[in-house]
């Protein structure tokens, strides 16, 4: 009888990536098959996020539902991972004694041993340590699930913004070696992946070891990824302005594989608030980066993160944020009301902005961003956009859907063989969250050519050291 695994994931793209790796790992080691139905599962895993308000209570609310399943099936294994697990540790079991496994973002690779331990002597396991980059050495080979893929290039963050829990839950910055990253991407390209999204809490701080022992920069890595045959688009998230250096901007100037879209969090337009947040940059410095980017790539579109109602934020501070939004002309944003995260410096600040005022500021900010986003979309009306076709449309299974370079979802009529390929689409309608168009050119009509297959690149560039260990040498 097939053993089944159910994973519920909350939070960022890093968590989505981690959950996919958990599924691949437990399939390889235990033969667990994913199920969307928790009642069918032999193992339930909750991959948590501590960024949102009341994150801990949300976890225990979900665990309360799963407790009923465990009462019906005592052999059911329940595990809690992610950032809340890293923060709370053994405290989770004090409130939910039926939880069998507690693991952090850096110990998910040990899940097979944890499950074996629980199956063996029924003793609970808690492992929320930070074992450097070990987890990537223990994960199975990547499996493509469509033409796009996430690839983690680093873990953790050293910035210690006063509102953020990431350095405490994921540890400080650790970069994967470049050959590991490039080999994983080449394997994905061999399976039909055309677009990769490089992940990290602060990707532009990547300083990975190269095959010759030197230390690479993020700009170096972007160019190496762009050189992999079969990879036509590169995205990355998330970045910090303080390390968005000129060499990265130069990659936008000379590397067409890097898309004309950037998510660069700023959080506030007030230097006073930025200082309270520990952001180490000013609004003017942020705008200077954007000016350089648009000089290198005039059509680039920018999204950002904003926190409203941070302790001490005045009406004047908020107006400065609104001015920054207008000056930069952001395309979209992830914007939130401040809520204190336990254990962070901001949690000790006086939360002196009334709740109704926070809500009003958030509404004003989001309305302005939505207006700007719609204006950007209207400029695309009547233009021809190159779309990477990802699959069927969520709105209509008889239609296809894909994304433009600037991250717009486009729905259109097409045929199944277009999935995983590029098509040129004329934009005919504009909606708040998507565009609509008609195909004017298929990939076969574009004259695109792959000079060398990903399989041959892997075979040609694979080397072995004196111990017989293979590595990828560009």
From Swiss-Prot:
GO molecular function terms noted in the UniProt entry: 4 iron, 4 sulfur cluster binding; metal ion binding; N6-isopentenyladenosine methylthiotransferase activity
Record's keyword terms, sorted: 4Fe-4S, Cytoplasm, Iron, Iron-sulfur, Metal-binding, S-adenosyl-L-methionine, Transferase, tRNA processing
Family matches, as SUPFAM superfamilies: Radical SAM enzymes
EC main group: transferase
Subcellular location: Cytoplasm
Enzyme Commission number(s): 2.8.4.3
Family: Belongs to the methylthiotransferase family. MiaB subfamily.
Protein's name according to its UniProt entry: tRNA-2-methylthio-N(6)-dimethylallyladenosine synthase
Species the sequence originates in: Salmonella typhimurium (strain LT2 / SGSC1412 / ATCC 700720)
């Amino acid at each position: 009888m097939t053993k089944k695994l159910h994973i519920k994931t909350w939070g960022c793209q890093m968590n989505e990536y981690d959950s996919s790796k958990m599924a691949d790992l437990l399939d390889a080691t235990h033969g667990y098959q994913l199920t969307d139905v928790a009642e069918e599962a032999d193992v339930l895993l909750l991959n948590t996020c501590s960024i949102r308000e009341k994150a801990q209570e949300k976890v225990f609310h979900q665990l309360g539902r799963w407790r009923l399943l465990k009462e019906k099936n005592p052999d059911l294994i329940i595990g809690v991972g992610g950032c809340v697990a890293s923060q709370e540790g053994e405290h989770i079991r004090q409130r939910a004694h039926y939880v069998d496994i507690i693991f952090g973002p850096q110990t998910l690779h040990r899940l097979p041993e944890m499950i074996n331990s629980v199956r063996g002597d029924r003793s609970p396991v808690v492992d929320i340590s930070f074992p450097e980059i070990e987890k990537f050495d223990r994960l199975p080979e990547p499996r493509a699930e469509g033409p796009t893929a996430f690839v983690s290039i680093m873990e953790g963050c050293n910035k210690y913004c006063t509102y953020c829990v990431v350095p405490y839950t994921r540890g400080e910055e650790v970069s994967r070696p470049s050959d590991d990253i490039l080999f994983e991407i080449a394997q994905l390209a061999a399976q039909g992946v055309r677009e990769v999204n490089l992940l990290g809490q602060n990707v532009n701080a990547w300083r990975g070891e190269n095959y010759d022992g030197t230390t690479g920069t993020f700009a170096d890595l972007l160019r190496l990824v762009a050189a992999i045959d079969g990879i036509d688009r590169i995205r990355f998230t998330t970045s910090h302005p303080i390390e968005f250096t000129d060499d990265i901007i130069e990659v936008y100037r000379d590397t067409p594989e890097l898309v004309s879209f950037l998510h660069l969090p700023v959080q506030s337009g007030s230097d006073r608030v930025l200082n309270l947040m520990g952001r180490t940059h000013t609004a003017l410095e942020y705008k200077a980066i954007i000016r350089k980017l648009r000089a290198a790539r005039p059509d680039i579109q920018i999204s950002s993160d904003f926190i409203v109602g941070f302790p001490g934020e005045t009406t004047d501070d908020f107006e400065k944020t609104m001015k920054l939004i207008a000056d930069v002309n952001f395309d979209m944003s992830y914007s939130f009301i401040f809520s204190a995260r336990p254990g962070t410096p901001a949690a000790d600040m006086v939360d002196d902005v009334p709740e109704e005022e926070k809500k009003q500021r958030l509404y004003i900010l989001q309305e302005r961003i939505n207006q700007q986003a719609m204006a950007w979309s209207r400029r695309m009306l009547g233009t021809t956009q190159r779309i990477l076709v990802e699959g069927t449309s969520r709105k209509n299974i008889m239609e296809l859907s894909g994304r433009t370079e600037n991250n717009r979802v486009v729905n259109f009529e097409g045929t199944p063989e277009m999935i995983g390929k590029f098509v040129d689409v004329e934009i005919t309608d504009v909606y708040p969250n998507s565009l609509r168009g008609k195909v004017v050119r298929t990939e076969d009509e574009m004259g695109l050519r792959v000079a060398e297959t990903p399989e041959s690149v892997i075979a040609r560039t694979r080397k072995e050291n004196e111990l017989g260990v293979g590595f990828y040498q560009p």
